[in-house]
């Protein structure tokens, strides 16, 4: 629940901030703050059906983006390259009891270790309205040479509120990998021969190749399920984000938490789910896709194992097309390849090749 709840919180933050950035905005109304137990159960709330916290978002965090005074940023994108300059407009929505005179607005950009890359401040009168322009903030990204998650924070001291956003910066020039695996689109004779010889194989399953009963009929999307799939007659999406171990070495060059954030948006938008219920009961994919709570299948979009004398990585994300326009997909592929070229690539589970083949159309 924590991982799907964090995605739900991210989606609520995006919706509410979009409303607050809208000219002529006159207020917002959410469907509910708590889960609705009727009509097949709608798990739409950040509180449960008894109005109790679920444990994935606190009132304090929710207030950072849903409050009478909220700092806002108009990001053109959330994934950047290190040959770009981050330059984004900062604004404020203020609907307090009275205007704020000479409000002190501070901002900073920091990495995951807390090191500040840039900071600054503005002094601004805040009338009771929204779309109040404050100024542009940002910094050059050329000093970032490794895949990095940054946090952009803005605080209005007089309003006692601080909002923040995660962004990602990836290097334009990637590390050369000398020991590339054999890349295949099916577990054919050539791929099996290489595995039997002890080689590494990366199986990139093409979009649309997964059989319907093995996940091809599951509509994957970045956002969460609305209401429930039973009541909406399988309205897409059918999933609730990803769950992974951020410390897994396959993700070492793709900074992430254990749940979805915006660096996963492109990947989730161009992937197929794989149903892994026929795999061992205790088997866990590298990147788990959280299923609809009515079906609760074991879904994956990246998994690994041993076959014969070799090692196999299977991915159902599109990591081959338009990579020059898809920096997150390009970096995710790089992270997988670096892992497969290292001594850390040593899966503990032996897979049945027929169960792998059973996932996709022949």
Task: Please annotate each region the language model reported.
Residues 1-102, 283-285:
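Substrate-binding clefts and catalytic carboxylate motifs of secreted carbohydrate-active enzymes
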Residues 3-11, 293-295, 328-332:
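Soluble or luminal CAZymes and related metallo-dependent hydrolases
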Residues 35-41, 116, 190, 209-212, ...:
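Flexible loop/turn segments at secondary-structure boundaries
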Residues 83-125, 132-140, 148-157:
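Beta-strand-rich binding/interaction modules
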Residues 158-164:
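Short, exposed coil/turn segments at beta-strand boundaries within extracellular/luminal domains
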Residues 165-186:
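Low-complexity, Pro/Ser/Thr- and charge-rich linker/hinge segments at domain boundaries
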Residues 179-228, 306-309, 315, 336-339:
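Short alpha-beta junction capping motif
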Residues 209-211, 228-327, 344-362:
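Catalytic beta-strand/loop cores that center a nucleophilic Ser/Cys/Thr
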């Amino acid at each position: 629940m924590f991982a799907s709840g964090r995605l739900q919180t991210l989606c609520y933050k995006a919706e509410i901030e979009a409303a607050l950035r809208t000219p002529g905005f006159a207020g917002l109304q959410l469907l509910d703050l708590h889960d609705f137990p009727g009509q097949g159960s709608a798990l739409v709330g950040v509180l449960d059906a008894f109005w109790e916290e679920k444990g994935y978002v606190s009132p304090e965090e929710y207030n950072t983006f849903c409050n009478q005074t909220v700092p806002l940023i108009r990001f053109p994108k959330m994934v950047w390259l290190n040959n770009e300059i981050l330059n984004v407009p900062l604004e404020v929505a203020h609907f307090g009891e009275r205007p704020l005179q000479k409000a002190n607005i501070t901002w900073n950009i920091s990495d995951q270790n807390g090191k500040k890359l840039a900071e600054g401040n503005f002094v601004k009168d805040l009338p009771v309205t929204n779309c109040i322009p404050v100024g542009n903030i940002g910094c050059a990204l050329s000093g970032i040479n490794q895949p990095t998650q940054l946090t952009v924070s803005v605080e209005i001291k007089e309003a006692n509120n601080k909002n923040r956003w995660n962004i990602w910066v990836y290097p334009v020039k990637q590390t050369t990998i000398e020991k590339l695996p054999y890349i295949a689109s099916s577990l054919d004779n050539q791929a099996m021969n290489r595995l039997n010889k002890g080689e590494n194989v990366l199986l990139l399953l093409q979009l649309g190749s997964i059989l319907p009963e093995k996940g091809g009929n599951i509509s994957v999307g970045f956002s969460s399920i609305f209401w429930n799939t039973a009541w909406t007659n399988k309205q897409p999406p059918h999933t609730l984000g990803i769950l992974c171990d951020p410390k897994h070495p396959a993700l070492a060059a793709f900074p992430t938490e254990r749940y979805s954030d915006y660096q996963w948006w492109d990947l989730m938008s161009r992937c197929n789910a794989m149903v892994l219920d026929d795999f061992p009961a205790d088997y866990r994919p590298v990147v788990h896709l959280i299923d609809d709570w009515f079906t609760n299948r074991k879904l994956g979009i990246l998994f690994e194992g041993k076959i014969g004398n070799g090692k196999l990585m299977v991915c159902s994300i599109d990591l081959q097309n338009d990579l020059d326009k898809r920096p997150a997909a390009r970096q995710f592929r790089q992270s997988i390849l670096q892992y497969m070229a290292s001594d850390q690539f040593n899966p503990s589970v032996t897979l049945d090749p027929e169960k792998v083949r059973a996932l996709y159309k022949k």
